[in-house]
Amino acid sequence: LGLATLSTEEARVLAGLGNRWNGRLPNVKNLSPETAAVLAGFKGVNEVVNKVVRLELDGATLSAETVRELARFPGVLLLRGLTQAALSDDMLAALGEYNGGGLGLGGLTALSPDLAKRLATFATKFLFLDDVIELSTEAAQALAGFPGSVSLDGLTELSPELARALGDLRKRSLKGVTSLSPEAAAAVVEGFQGNDLTLNLTSLPADTAKELAKGRYNSLFLDRLTELSDEAAAALGECSLTNLWLRRLTELSPGAAKGLAGLKAAGQLGPTLRLDSLRSLSPEAAEAFAASNITYLELIGLKTLSAGTARALARSKAFSGSLPGLTTLSADAAA
């Protein structure tokens, strides 16, 4: 909505819409505590079956009194336009009481160690700090004390020191990081104690792949990779995994396929390999997969299928047999 002001009566109308309203009021300035009480606590609003699940407001113009009312909101609370200067002690105290679906502090591009330490004491279980583009090791160490999940998707670089300082990486979202040095990858592997590791890497040097292969997790999801060298594939082939997903690869050389064919199971399950976007597969690559220990192979993106590839896949116990994207099939392959 393009509203610049909001009365309590207007707030009751919006709150009464429940989840039919998206909760966005980015242009409203100086929201009063009374109006905030209506939006956040549904004061004076008739019973709504499905209440609004998110509020998005201009946080820079809010008073501490207004924030105290907003802290009662049970859904996700997103405050835009904030700066460290705008976050007074009174406002931080009020925000610290919020225990709804998740707190977003938009506009903060950096965190001082003192502010990070304060945020670590907040009651909420989810912090969205996606505008932060700079984070010192000291601030990361302070933020590591926060027991919930923290989204830091605005960070684009991750040093080994920062990876170690962030604490439990199972609870840290770093979707903006698209490359890792071998040293940073080693730190990620060291700090990640979960089952499924998702990385938004768009490039994967062989040395980095070697470090990732040392991890003790069930699944490795690298779904933004569009290219994979033979050397990096060979390194990934040293992994013991239940699942390896490379769902954006459009091409795979025979050498890379032979490297991936070395995958080993983690425990009793797998390994499974998803290559959903591959458009073609050479007979040599298909032969490598057919002879591997892979238990499930997804190739739903294949556009063409040669006779040699078809014969090799027919011998594979892993190939799912699903080829919904196939547009070209030779007579020999069909036979």
Predicted regions, residues:
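Short, intrinsically disordered, charge-balanced linker/junction segments flanking boundaries
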Residues: 330-335
